[in-house]
Design a protein with these regions (language model features):
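Conserved non-catalytic scaffold segment of RNase H-like nuclease domains
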Residues: 1-109, 124-146
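Short, glycine/acidic-enriched loop or turn micro-motifs at the edges of active sites
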Residues: 11-13, 117, 154
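Catalytic-loop motifs flanking and including active-site residues across diverse enzymes
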Residues: 92, 111, 151-154
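Conserved beta-strand -> loop -> alpha-helix junction used to position metal-binding or nucleic-acid-contacting
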Residues: 106-119
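Generic alpha-helical structural context detector
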Residues: 117-120, 136, 157-160
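Acidic, divalent-metal-coordinating active-site segment for phosphoryl/phosphodiester hydrolysis
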Residues: 147-160
Length: 163
């Protein structure tokens, strides 16, 4: 796959709509040409302990952050006519659909690909198919795991190798 947008969300709690950060990496002709990162005020607006332990974000980080529709207005032109790619598509696509629903936005039915599924086919011998493991197999060192932009960049790297 030569043209796509890798996407990753982090959530504040167990609600898929509670996206608190997003990372996007734009790939054209097999090269990373742009990226985008934003904190987002989650909906519902509370953090649970476990999610904060994973990504390190808390209420204070997103108190002054924009709400999702304002962030998506910046993302939409970047990803126009591009398929989306995520590592564990059900999670990220689920987040996107849930937050669109919460804000009563029309979901454009994005074409979505999954590097997790692809890695299970391409690298059957791996002990696991977690993002950092698959990224390393593809020659990418993921240093800031669970930062949405770092995870989107790792996903883009994987997608360029196996999709």
């Amino acid at each position: 796959m030569k043209d796509f947008a890798a996407i990753d969300f982090e959530t504040a709690n167990n609600e898929r709509s509670s996206v608190c950060s997003v990372g996007i990496v734009i790939v054209r002709n097999g090269e990373i040409v742009d990226s985008f990162y934003s904190l987002i005020q989650p909906e519902p607006n509370y953090y649970n302990y476990w999610c904060s332990q994973v990504h390190g974000l808390c209420h204070e980080d997103t108190d002054d952050a924009p709400v999702f529709p304002k962030v998506w207005a910046q993302i939409e032109p970047l990803i126009e006519n591009l398929p989306l790619v995520a590592h564990n598509k059900p999670f990220d696509e689920g987040c996107l659909k849930a937050v669109f629903r919460v804000y009563q936005m029309d979901y454009p039915d994005y074409e979505f690909y999954d590097t997790l599924v692809a890695s299970r086919r391409a690298f059957r011998y791996l002990e696991n198919h977690q993002l950092h493991t698959v990224a390393a197999e593809c020659g990418y060192c993921l240093e800031n795991h669970h930062n949405a932009l770092a995870d989107a960049e790792a996903c883009a790297w994987i997608a360029r190798e196996i999709l």
